[in-house]
Amino acid sequence: MELSHLALVCAAIAFSSIFVVSQAGITSTHARVSEPSEEMSLETFPPPAGYNAPEQVHITQGDNAGRAMIISWVMPLNEDGSNVVTYWIASSDGSDNKNAIATTSSYRYFNYTSGYLHHATIKKLEYDPSKSRSRCSLHIRYYSDLGQTYASNQTLYNYMSNPKGQAVLFVGDLSYADDHPNHDQRKWDSYGRFVEPSAAYQPWSWAAGNYEIDYAQSISETQPFKPYKNRYHVPYKASQSTSPLWYSIKRASTYIIVLSSYSAYDKYTPQNSWLQDELKKVNRSETSWLIVLVHAPWYNSNNYHYMEGESMRVTFEPWFVENKVDIVFAGHVHAYERSKRISNIHYNITDGMSTPVKDQNAPIYITIGDGGNIEGIANSFTDPQPSYSAFREASFGHALLEIKNRTHAHYTWHRNKEDEAVIADSIWLKKRYYLPEEETA
């Protein structure tokens, strides 16, 4: 299992660019048309040929420390042996085979019954490279609001065409099944087949978005997150979480915290208590970079979903500044935006207002809800551009975070342009914990 790089796919598509520069930042006038993206049909991703063939294979980190992997797949029949994963050390001749036995389940949703969902955890894996975690470089890609449209396909193609990156962090809104009548669960199956060419070979980790809730009282489906929780397992118990909707993992020199925008988070709630304890566990001499994933953005200058993350921001932002979180990735808004390092935690006694101010101990907030979903682009930014916004564009695309060492990382966002990705935004990042200094593009 490689921990040498960490890459980050954020999602976008567009044409030629013009930039409007203000004291606030850059608003790119390069915008993709806002009409909904055309969704690929169910027939685009048929079940694989062969008797009881496994499908929708995906892998995710299986513990907090990175020494385990969860292998997940779906099969139409639950036969003997169909729940076993055989594995061995890559450098061996295969004679030291080991088996991992999967848990098996199936779920019903309205008039749909899933195939047999298997999740097997393989443990005691070796790090590659086997060197100090704090010195490891890392590339992670981030997606959000992907769906399964032709625009989504371009985003995934561009990501897979880039040789960098060994992991994906997905910031919510996967299949968009609930955009269809009765939350058509077949769209969960087609989505699993769609992303399998990547998700079966590189570990994906997920945050849950609003489209994972799948709450439909009109058809008596009142268990939130039922399809998502059954299909996508995460190692939440390894970080002492009580829910798969919030958890943490360590990957090379990075500590990654996943939060839930759609679960209770106020004082005395399980998520609040867990995060308070979790931040105390972060050892910056071991994992120098601290990254948070949350679906609804806290800083967003788009009219779509404006201020939806405000109550969560008020609850947790002081902790993020105190603990010098480096980056917060969000989705939800179907556009791209990067903030400056700002905080809004101090009350102004003069005018009674609380406004964002420059703060070198604060995170950069990046919205990457631009994966290519069926609903199209959110192309209505507020005017003028607020002072906290550094760059924004109404397009689809992907991004790459290259963590070079314990103090420096390079971030790029690539808009989709026809059959290639073009770098539209970039910045060198300096670790908040060691170098709380101004950063440059």
UniProtKB/Swiss-Prot annotation:
Protein name according to UniProt: Purple acid phosphatase 11
Enzyme Commission number(s): 3.1.3.2
Primary localization class, coarse: secreted
Record's keyword annotation contains Cytoplasm: no
Cellular localization per UniProt: Secreted
Residues spanning the signal sequence: 1-24
Gene name of the record: PAP11
Superkingdom field: Eukaryota
Residues modified by glycosylation: N111, N153, N283, N348, N405
Enzyme class of the recorded protein, top EC level: hydrolase
Quaternary organization: Homodimer.
Family: Belongs to the metallophosphoesterase superfamily. Purple acid phosphatase family.
Necessary cofactors: Fe cation; Zn(2+)
Expression sites (tissue/organ): Specifically expressed in flowers.
Induction comment: By phosphate deprivation.
